[in-house]
Amino acid sequence: MVDSHDAETYSAKDSRLIWIDCEMTGLDIFGGDELVEVSVVPTDFDLNVLDEGVDYVIKPSEKAVNHMNDFVRQMHTRSGLINEWENGLSLAEAEQKVTEYVLRFTPEGVRPLLAGNTIGSDKKFLDHYMPNLMSHLHYRSVDVSTFKELARRWYPAVYENRPPKNGGHRALADIIESLDELRYYRKAFMAPAPGPDDAASKAIAADIVATSILNK
């Protein structure tokens, strides 16, 4: 399959990551679980924060609240979120505000990448509940949990000494912790910038091709 998006070229100033974290009433989107909090922080690809970010609490339906299991209910009670969503925004209001915020940091004609931790779960809910927002983002994403799983298996010391987390299951704090975690992995086990030069990169690529099982 040909990926037409590989033809997209961005200058450094156009490169953006849109970090998003969501809190939900559960993970069963088809069983009626809903978004109750969405936070966004924009960064460049060097992981420099471009703005302090936004956080919006969304009022869930009574059905979604009643659908919560005890674990989720206790989690949102401890974080204080359960006491805030009664005065939260409607889903439509939240999507509009988040979309407007994202577009402030998106150069015209560019769709930034979504970033986060175990971002697949968040993306599933965003695709379902905030399709207009997602239409402005690239279909690719940066998932910090990928680096975590690689570190766990390839660099155990890096994994064991990763920065501690204490976000308390609030979306904005979770984003900052995920961002810091990726900054840590970048310093701990990735080649220092600017990485291998052109000749070294070609040599590495040639070695990979030569040893690929496709050539056996």
UniProtKB/Swiss-Prot annotation:
Enzyme class label: hydrolase
Keywords carried by this UniProt record: Cytoplasm, Exonuclease, Hydrolase, Nuclease
Chain coiled-coil ranges: none
SUPFAM superfamilies (alphabetical): Ribonuclease H-like (SSF53098)
Exonuclease domain span: 17-182
Annotated CDD domains: Orn
GO molecular function: 3'-5'-RNA exonuclease activity; nucleic acid binding
Alphabetized Gene3D superfamilies for the sequence: Ribonuclease H-like superfamily/Ribonuclease H
Catalytic residues (UniProt): 139
GO terms under cellular component: cytoplasm
Protein purpose: 3'-to-5' exoribonuclease specific for small oligoribonucleotides.
Family stated for the protein in its record: Belongs to the oligoribonuclease family.
UniProt name for this protein: Oligoribonuclease
Encoding gene (name): orn
